[in-house]
Amino acid sequence: MSDDIDDPRRDFLVKMLTAGAFATGVWSLPATVQSMGKIPKLLPPGKSFFDISGEVMVNNKLATLDTFVKNNDVVSTGSGAHAVFVVGKDAFILRGNSSMEIEGNEIISTIRVFSGKLLSVFGHREDKKPLHMRSSTATIGIRGTGVYIESDPEKTYLCTCYGITDLSSNVDKNVQERIVSEHHDKPKYLLAKPSQKGKLITPAPMINHTDMELTLIEELVGREPPFGLEGGLYKGPRRDY
């Protein structure tokens, strides 16, 4: 990825930051991004965290910006905290009161979201095998995409921000659905108990995450999302830099 400020995408990010867009809420951003105040760029080797606020733990030890996150680690956050970090080709924003485990050998194979809220962008798997996300009520197959998930015992919220996901209910493995999304097209709830219409997978609104956040964490792994940040228009597959 080039650091050239003439890159229109990075130039736009710089303008938003220097104009105080984060602080003024122009983009209606959560505190996760408002508090950063720095331009994202490809993280160097050996670096995991881009931003930490509040109590962030890795394997039950208090994390700092120098903490390295690797496969088979557990990352958790306290009330009002957040963590923005990278593992390999994948990047995450873990919001407050959340806990996740990263499973895998050389690359991530499974993300377990025990509780809370997680925004993720995933690179394409070199072994061509799908990565899985697991929550209390859902199993999600993922290939090179961006997703936002909220997990609690009663339901899982999932927005396939772009790309393809395969949803499966943990309550009934026969309940499955493939989502093909260009730009937050088909958010879903995966329920612990059937809805009034007897459904375990139901439509949902887009909530609690933004295109600016997706752009920021894609930057950390040297990619750009498949939409125009200024207008949100779909413009094709993601590009690596």
Report each predicted region and the residues it spans.
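Secretory targeting signals
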Residues: 1-11
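Flexible, surface-exposed loop/linker segments and immediately adjacent secondary-structure boundaries
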Residues: 12, 16-20, 27, 32-70, ...
